[in-house]
Amino acid sequence: MSREEVFEKLNEVFRDVFDDDSITVGETTTAEDIEDWDSLEHINLLAAVEQEFGIKFNMGQVVSMKNVGEMSDIIISQIN
């Protein structure tokens, strides 16, 4: 799966989790960029991403993610 395809799927997941069709995430998107992205929604988001891509994040990966670009790096490393 290409990086573009990962971001297409991530956009769908973010829109579903935050119930906002206007969201478009990019490499540098962080929780500060999305109004409703709090700690509870972060857990929901991670679970939805794991389900969408058929992966599991470990605690070290979760802690190291600083933005959506880093999330996509981890996803790509697990699916390719």
What are these regions (language model features)?
Residues S2-W37, E41-A47, Q51-N80:
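Phosphopantetheine-dependent thiolation modules in NRPS/PKS and related acyl-activating systems
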